[in-house]
Regions:
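Conserved alpha-helix/loop element of class I SAM-dependent methyltransferases that forms part
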Residues: 1-26, 37-40, 44
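A short acidic, Gly/Pro-enriched loop at the edge of an enzyme's catalytic core
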Residues: 23, 75-76, 86-97
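A short glycine-rich, Lys/Arg-flanked "PGG" loop and its adjoining helix->strand segment in the class I
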Residues: 43, 111-126
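Conserved SAM/SAH-binding beta-strand->alpha-helix loop
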Residues: 57-59
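Conserved SAM-binding loop
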Residues: 64-65
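Short, glycine-/aromatic-enriched active-site segment of Class I SAM-dependent methyltransferases
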Residues: 133-154
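Short alpha-helix
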Residues: 156-170
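C-terminal lobe and adjacent flexible extensions of AdoMet/dcAdoMet transferase-like proteins
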Residues: 170-228
């Protein structure tokens, strides 16, 4: 795996590991960051497949392109787009799989992001998502600070019940939780010190302590069923 991709990864899971990606698939990675999941997906889809990485930060797109080159995959069908996740400008029914690794919780309009994922998927296409949710509510002022000082996979996280409601209201069915993990204090501290502080500064120690035992990483898949 290219070092640039590993150094810039803020992921909380490995969605390509449970997405059942097959040779020839078209995969779109929401919030591709430094490109780690794009590289992994490209190996799985093979020369006949296609991978598109979407990210809102031009700096990350450039680093993801570097990761693809370092992995020797520059001749594969890999594309990067600098755009918001809810405005990919990809055609309807474009992808077999949409992946995302601890990014959607950072988006202010999660409904629009999941609606966009649903739109670009083919019938029987699937999402494979790793993300962060809250197992307990936290104080509004603390939540607000997360959105401005904690990009380490936590800013914008919402209660788990609200998260599943968002996924289903976008049209997805057969939601299957692959894994759930309550983050330990050590993991929370690691997120606070994760790469990317040139974009967002880390939170205070007091804020980290305040959310201990309330933050969960989830991995799940869901299906876009064909119209009857």
């Amino acid at each position: 795996m290219p070092e640039v991709a590993l150094n810039l990864s803020r992921g909380c899971g490995n969605p390509t590991g449970f997405a059942n990606i097959r040779p020839g698939d078209v995969v779109v990675d929401f919030g591709c960051g430094g490109g780690i999941d794009v590289v992994l997906a490209a190996h799985k889809v093979g020369p006949q497949g296609r991978v598109v990485g979407i990210d809102g930060a031009p700096q990350m797109i450039e680093r993801a392109k570097q990761a693809v080159a370092e992995a020797g995959l520059q001749d594969r069908n890999i594309e990067f787009r600098n755009s918001y996740l809810n405005k990919t400008q990809l055609p309807d029914g474009f992808a077999d799989v949409v992946t995302s690794n601890c990014v959607i919780n950072l988006c202010p309009d999660k409904d629009a992001v999941y609606e966009e994922a649903f739109r670009i998927l083919r019938p029987n296409g699937r999402i494979a998502i790793s993300d962060i949710v809250l197992s307990e509510n936290i104080a509004p002022e603390l939540q607000e600070r997360f959105q401005t000082t904690w990009a380490g996979c936590l800013g914008g996280a919402i209660p788990e019940e609200d998260y599943w409601r968002t996924v289903r209201q976008a049209g997805f069915a057969e939601v299957q939780i692959v894994a759930r993990h309550l983050l330990t204090p050590e993991e929370l501290e690691g997120m606070a010190c994760c790469p990317g502080e040139e974009f967002t500064p880390p939170p205070s120690k007091e804020d980290r302590v305040a959310v201990e035992g309330k933050v969960t990483s989830v991995k799940f898949i869901a299906i876009k069923l064909p119209l009857k």
